[in-house]
Regions:
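Carbohydrate-interacting/catalytic domains
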Residues: 1-85, 90, 107, 438-458, ...
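Short, solvent-exposed loop/turn segments at secondary-structure junctions
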Residues: 3, 89-94, 133-135, 202, ...
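Substrate-binding/active-site clefts of carbohydrate-active enzymes
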Residues: 37-38, 44-45, 51-54, 88-269, ...
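Short, solvent-exposed loop/turn segments at the edges of secondary structure
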Residues: 80-82, 150-155, 219-220, 238-240, ...
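Beta-sheet entry/capping signal
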Residues: 82-83, 125-128, 192-194, 270-271, ...
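Short acidic (Asp/Glu) and glycine-rich catalytic loops that position anionic groups and cofactors
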Residues: 271-276, 336, 428-434, 494-502, ...
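Conserved alpha/beta catalytic core and glycan-binding cleft of carbohydrate-active enzymes
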Residues: 283, 288-479, 484, 492-496, ...
């Protein structure tokens, strides 16, 4: 039990000067919050002015002494081993009955041993918390009895949001709230888990020009906010919130950097995810990757060694900038999200109605690490595939379970007549909108698919989860997706501070099976280095072992990584599918990877190869054929003692026979023996219905895949475990 000194006297700021009270740019005599102070009290920002004293009600700063005590050292998980888990402080544990009630939904609850054990057993290395800066909801939400649950309505950059602290800490004051936040970080670090904060530096809670004067606007409206034509009453909005902070102003850049250093040095967090990060890099002529703020992130001695992640867009002109941020920033990869959903859901929905989809080309590009987006840095290839924070879902949008249950958003509960939230979901309800009983069917079949809806939905969830975990890059899982959390079709639950948004821990049998599957897939990722590359694939042969044989590789169609070469008899134009340095369109063949003609005898196998359903290389036509829905990806062991990994997938609506490929025998080595370690057709990774003898196969063997399924094979060489993570 820590003893906290009584809070220091309040530290509000009084506006004074000739500006009239009604002016949109000031409030003479009013109280405003100091955005640079570390503590916050007051919870009635929108009450009418009290001519006697508004201080007891309005949010205002309190000076907080620097906290004492040493924090546990940062885990410093390498990017290649990183698994991000996006969570809301309240939503993660509010329904976790294994926690004492007073800890649920709090900073302390996130670091409770039960919550930590869940994260560790899942395989999470890094928790990314939705905003924890002090924030206030918008007036129109409060007027309708709602709140901004996500917290993207920042009041100040320093003080933590007190409502996420335990009641005891709130009653003890801002110093106790800060101690609880630091204690959370400390305990997570002791468990080997990093903490990233989602920070909102692009706008504030003060709304548009007719908004309230709570802090920044009352202090210096013209100096802090981006304006249209320099007129204080005409705000330029590139964030969709009514205002945007002006990162052309040194004072704004300084405020953001000071805040980041404070949270890193005093609170001990391991990094940040920057909301609408393009706004933070906007200069006089638009987004600039050499913007002073971004340069500071690269050079500041406190910040440059942290994990930094950009949300690479905003809603202003030229706002989509995925792949264009400088190192050391990683970026949310929306192209990965779209490609995974498109292949497994939207294209499958189209196919069920007899319409063509998009083929395998874009999916292959994302599985290979999205080099078309992240392989163009200066110097070239300095970022690598780990710069792609790949995800299928995030806090905004459908949950993983809802992606397979709804074709359309169901947001009426948000109070905006279902106008809010995106309509570009790329989802598929599998024939019936909304929840179904475990044995529900659509007339017994699904438009020609003789399967029940519920099992097929569950398989689609597993396909999406496996695509995320097996892809080159940094996977991000949204809290609860590993347990089938639903928001009942709401794809914009920002106002739902209730069971709609909170993670449910009361698991039905299928949700327990899904959790076991998620743990199994992340364990496979940890165990096999071929699934965790930190450099882009080249498609070229790896160096042979000192005593390894030289042999011929007869055109295995690997150029999906390098996108170079002319292609021999067996060469393909797979560079267009998953090219790296040159980008997807730059590839002309797989010759350098798989033989530039008969008689060429490289000394080793390539790091990446692609095959069709017959076990042969994909030709140019196949890469561009929307009807091709089956793909095999072979990643060879990066070091002796590691295992090769073969991923076999089909988006076809009927079962498919696939011939397993091989590379090592063609190179004069020992033929592969493939061991089946996972199949998305399995409800549980230890599926008792697995057929005897199906777990092992040789190259050339023909295996049967269920419709819309994915398999993972590995060579039997014992893998080396990645350090520092649970088995």
């Amino acid at each position: 039990n820590l003893h906290h000194p009584p809070p220091t006297p309040p530290h509000p700021l009084h506006i004074d000067g000739p500006v009239p009270f009604e002016s949109p740019t000031g409030l003479a005599g009013a109280l405003v919050d100091d955005p640079a102070i570390r503590g916050q009290v007051g919870d009635d920002p929108y009450g009418p002015p009290d001519p006697r004293d508004s201080l007891p009600f309005v949010p205002h700063a309190v000076v907080v002494a620097e906290p004492a005590g040493t924090l546990a050292p940062r885990p410093r998980v390498p990017w290649r081993d990183t698994v991000v888990y996006e969570a809301h402080v309240r939503g993660l544990t509010q329904r976790l009955e294994a926690l004492p009630e007073h800890l649920r939904g709090t900073y302390a609850g996130v670091a409770h041993p039960v919550a930590i054990e869940h994260l560790r057993s899942l395989g999470v290395t890094t928790v990314e918390l939705l905003p924890v800066h002090a924030n206030v909801p918008e007036p129109h939400l409060l007027a309708s009895g709602r709140t901004n649950y996500w917290g993207y309505s920042t009041l100040g950059f320093f003080a933590p949001h007190a409502a996420y602290a335990t009641r005891a800490a709130q009653d003890a004051g801002p110093a106790a709230v800060l101690d609880e936040v630091r204690g959370m970080v400390h305990l997570l670090h002791e468990a080997g888990i990093e903490v990233l904060l989602d920070v909102v530096h692009n706008h504030t809670c003060e709304g548009g020009a007719d908004g309230y004067h709570l802090s920044w606007r009352g202090l210096d409206n013209a100096g802090y906010y981006l304006h249209d034509g320099g007129t204080p009453a005409r705000l330029a909005d590139v964030t969709g919130t009514g205002n945007s902070l002006d990162f052309r102003r040194p004072a704004v850049v300084r405020a953001a950097l000071d805040s980041l250093r404070y949270w890193a040095e005093v609170v001990g967090v391991d990094g940040f995810r920057f909301d609408l990060a393009v706004t933070l890099g906007r200069g006089a002529t638009g987004f600039d990757p050499d913007h002073p703020f971004l340069v500071a992130l690269q050079t500041d001695p406190v910040l440059c060694g942290l994990k930094l992640v950009a949300e690479p867009w905003d809603v202003g002109p030229g706002g989509w900038r995925t792949g264009q941020f400088p190192p050391p920033l990683a970026e949310w990869n929306d192209r990965f999200r779209d490609a995974a959903r498109q292949f497994w859901l939207a294209d499958a929905r189209e196919a069920s109605h007899g319409r063509p989809g998009h083929g395998v080309r874009d999916l292959a590009t994302r599985l290979a690490g999205s080099a078309d987006l992240f392989g163009h840095s200066d110097p070239p290839l300095v970022r690598g595939p780990v710069a792609s924070v790949s995800y299928v879902t995030a806090h905004d949008g459908f949950t993983l379970a809802d992606l397979v249950a709804y074709d359309h958003k169901h947001n009426l509960a948000n109070g905006e007549n279902n106008r809010d939230g995106t309509d570009d979901n790329r989802s598929w309800n599998h024939g019936l909108e909304g929840p179904v009983t475990p044995d529900a069917t659509a007339g017994g079949v699904l438009d020609g698919l003789g399967v029940e809806i519920a099992p097929l939905r569950r398989r689609s969830i597993r396909n999406l989860l496996a695509t995320l975990v097996l892809a080159a890059g940094t996977p991000m899982i949204t809290a609860g997706d590993e347990m089938g959390r639903t928001q009942r079709g709401n794809n914009n639950a920002y106002v739902q501070d209730d069971e709609t948004s909170w993670v449910s821990w009361d698991l039905s049998p299928w949700r327990k099976d899904l959790l076991a599957t998620a743990r199994h897939l992340l364990a496979l990722r940890r165990e096999h280095a071929a699934l965790r590359p930190d450099a882009f694939f080249t498609g070229r042969p790896r160096p042979a072992a000192p005593d390894g044989p030289a042999g011929a590789v007869s055109g295995a169609g690997t150029g999906a990584a390098a996108g170079t070469g002319t292609g021999g008899e067996g060469g393909t134009e797979a560079g267009a599918a998953a090219g790296t340095a040159a980008g997807g369109e730059g590839g002309t063949g797989a010759g350098t990877a798989a033989g530039s003609g008969q008689g060429h005898r490289p000394t080793a196998v390539p790091d990446l190869a692609w095959f069709d359903a017959d076990g042969g290389p994909l030709d140019h036509g196949a890469w561009h054929d929307p009807g091709v829905r089956t793909l095999q990806m072979l990643r060879t062991a990066p070091e002796p003692g590691d295992a090769d990994v073969l991923v076999v997938l089909t988006g076809a609506l009927d079962p498919v026979d696939v011939t397993l490929p091989g590379l090592r025998a063609a190179a004069g080595g020992e033929p592969e023996r493939w061991e089946l370690v996972w199949d998305s057709d399995w409800e549980h990774p230890d599926d008792p219905d697995r057929a005897p003898g199906e777990s092992a196969a040789r190259p050339g063997a023909v295996v049967g895949l269920e419709a819309l399924s994915l398999r993972v094979y590995v060579s039997p060489t014992p893998p080396r475990e990645s350090p520092g993570r649970p088995r």
